[in-house]
Amino acid sequence: MGNLSVNQNKLQKRLRRLAGEAVTDFNMIEDGDKVMVCLSGGKDSYTMLDVLLYLQKVAPIRFEVVAVNMDQKQPGFPEHVLPEYLKSIGVEYHIIEKDTYSVVKEKIPEGKTTCSLCSRLRRGTLYTFADEIGATKMALGHHRDDILETFFLNMFYGGTLKAMPPKLLSDDGRNVVIRPLAYCSEADIEAYSKMKEFPIIPCNLCGSQENLQRQVVKEMLQEWERKSPGRTEIMFRALQNVVPSQLADRNLFDFKSLRIDDSATPRFVDVMSL
C-alpha cells in the first residue's frame, strides 16, 4: 500500500485513537500482559490485530501480542491464508486445529442456525488455549455496532438490558476478555480493511445463514442512522450513562427503602408565594 490519502490518514488515525481510548478507559492492557488476539480472518479481527500492533509500538507500557486462529475444519477453509499473512508481518501465531464443524453438524438439525453452538465451542477452546500459553488477556474483534446490536437483541428477545462489555472476566475467573474496537464503527473498520487489503476469509464457509434476529436488528439500526445521522453514537453513549434509579431493577437500586426526608431542602419554587 502506497502513501495514504488525506481521508485514509484520517481513518487510520481515528481507529487508532478510538482503540487507544477504549484500552485506556477500561484498563484493557497492562504492563507485562500477554495479549492473545483471536483472529478469524474477517475484517474486524484483522483490523484489531493491526491496531494493537501499532499501540504496542507507541504505548508507554510493554506487552506481548500473539495471534491465534482456530481451524474448525470447515470445508473449503483456506488453511494457508492466515499463516502466510502472519509470517509476512512478523507476528507470533498459533493455529488450533479442532473439528467443531462436525460436532455442530451432528447436533444442529439441517436448516437451523449453527452460529450459537459453534461460537460456544470456539470460545471454550480459545479459553483453554489462552491458559496453555499463559495469555493474560484475550482480545476479540467486536466493535461498537456489535455491542449495540447485542443490546437490542437481549432487550427485544431476552428481556434483559445487557450487551457485550468492553472488558469481561470469564465465568470461571480464569480469563479476561477485552474488546479494543468497542468504540469503533463497523463502517470505519470495513473501509480500513479494504484500504489495507487484508486477505479476508469468508465467514459463511459452513453454509449457515447469519442469525436472522441479529440481521433484523442490524438493519433497524442502520435505518435509524440513515434517518438521523449520529444516533448510533448517542445510543452507544447511553450504555455508558446508566441511571439505575430511573429503571426498575430492584437488584441495582433499593426502591423499597425510599422514604421522605423531612430535613431535605425543597427543590421546587413555591409559586403560590410569588
From Swiss-Prot:
Pathway: tRNA modification
Function noted in UniProt: Catalyzes the ATP-dependent 2-thiolation of cytidine in position 32 of tRNA, to form 2-thiocytidine (s(2)C32). The sulfur atoms are provided by the cysteine/cysteine desulfurase (IscS) system.
Pfam family, one: ATP_bind_3
Designated name of the protein: tRNA-cytidine(32) 2-sulfurtransferase
Compartments, as annotated in UniProt: Cytoplasm
Listed InterPro entries: Rossmann-like_a/b/a_fold, TilS/TtcA_N, tRNA_Cyd_32_2_STrfase, tRNA_thiolation_TtcA_Ctu1
Gene (UniProt): ttcA
Note: The thiolation reaction likely consists of two steps: a first activation step by ATP to form an adenylated intermediate of the target base of tRNA, and a second nucleophilic substitution step of the sulfur (S) atom supplied by the hydrosulfide attached to the Fe-S cluster.
Naturally occurring in which organism (per UniProt): Stutzerimonas stutzeri (strain A1501)
Keyword Magnesium among UniProt keywords: yes
Family: Belongs to the TtcA family.
Cofactor note: Binds 1 [4Fe-4S] cluster per subunit. The cluster is chelated by three Cys residues, the fourth Fe has a free coordination site that may bind a sulfur atom transferred from the persulfide of IscS.
Subunit structure: Homodimer.
UniProt cross-references to CDD domains, sorted A to Z: TtcA-like
Enzymatic reactions: cytidine(32) in tRNA + S-sulfanyl-L-cysteinyl-[cysteine desulfurase] + AH2 + ATP = 2-thiocytidine(32) in tRNA + L-cysteinyl-[cysteine desulfurase] + A + AMP + diphosphate + H(+)
This protein's UniProt keywords: 4Fe-4S, ATP-binding, Cytoplasm, Iron, Iron-sulfur, Magnesium, Metal-binding, Nucleotide-binding, RNA-binding, Transferase, tRNA processing, tRNA-binding
Gene Ontology molecular functions: 4 iron, 4 sulfur cluster binding; ATP binding; magnesium ion binding; sulfurtransferase activity; tRNA binding
One Gene Ontology cellular component: cytoplasm
